[in-house]
């Protein structure tokens, strides 16, 4: 098993998840598994061919327009690479090595990479989903997010159900820290209990008229699932990276 033990959530943990919309489980993955995942990330860097890449940057509303080109939209069952916007100079040239410039690798790691598949699809994850009320859970997407030293851009507050929409809302996210992630280097942060207070106000959809993507406004109540929790990832102005998958 990739986990320390084939665990079940305790009643206290389930109550904490339902109350806060998030549950932290320390030391969930074995240390050797974390090391192998970080090694695999380096291997993925080595396979990257910059000459065949459209130089797609991972953009959010903070950058003016959310990413939405063909390379991004066709990444659900592939391993695609997305750059930090600040890794380029004013002429569009990379100013750092590739392994210090990538923001995200995704979104089909659980399909094409055995290392990431092993932490996504296994009996422990399935058991946790069952305890939280899921009857037929499916892995939708997987990614590695890298907060690069000095240029790791901020991701604004949002809910995952804006991007991974179902009705009723049922998306559940699992985040695994692969390095020491802190407020200084852009860790994941949530607004505790926000899944009980907010309505879904917008959805991320394809723009069939102009191409790319856009947000459309909606007004729907949010259900009690992890994807409804407001969360953000701060910028990394520190000289130490953070990674999570």
Region spans (language model):
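Conserved hydrophobic/aromatic beta-strand scaffold that supports enzyme active sites
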Residues: 22-24, 173-177, 243
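A structural signal for short, well-ordered beta-strand segments and their strand-loop junctions
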Residues: 24-27, 138-141, 173, 187-190
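Histidine-centered catalytic micro-motifs
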Residues: 155-162
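Short, conserved beta-strand element in jelly-roll/cupin
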Residues: 165-183
């Amino acid at each position: 098993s990739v986990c320390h033990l084939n665990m079940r959530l305790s009643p206290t943990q389930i109550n904490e998840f339902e109350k806060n919309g998030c549950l932290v489980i320390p030391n969930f993955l074995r240390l050797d598994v974390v090391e192998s995942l970080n090694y695999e990330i380096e291997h993925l860097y080595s396979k990257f061919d910059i000459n065949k890449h459209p130089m797609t940057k991972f953009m959010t509303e903070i950058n003016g327009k959310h990413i939405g080109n063909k390379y991004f939209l066709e990444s659900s069952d592939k391993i695609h690479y997305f750059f930090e916007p600040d890794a380029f100079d004013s002429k569009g040239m990379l100013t750092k090595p590739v392994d210090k410039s990538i923001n995200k690798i995704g979104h089909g790691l659980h399909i094409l990479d055995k290392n990431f598949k092993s932490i996504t699809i296994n009996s422990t994850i399935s058991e946790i989903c069952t305890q939280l009320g899921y009857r037929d859970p499916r892995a939708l997407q997987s990614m590695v997010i890298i907060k690069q030293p000095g240029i790791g851009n901020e991701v604004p507050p949002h809910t995952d159900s804006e991007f991974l929409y179902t009705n009723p809302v049922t998306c559940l996210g699992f985040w695994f820290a692969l390095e020491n992630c802190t407020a200084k280097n852009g860790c994941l942060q949530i607004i505790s209990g926000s899944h009980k207070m907010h309505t879904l106000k917008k959805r991320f959809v394809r723009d069939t008229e102009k191409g790319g993507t856009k947000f459309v406004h909606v007004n729907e109540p949010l259900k009690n699932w992890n994807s409804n929790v407001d969360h953000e990832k701060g910028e990394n102005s520190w000289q130490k990276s953070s990674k999570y998958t």
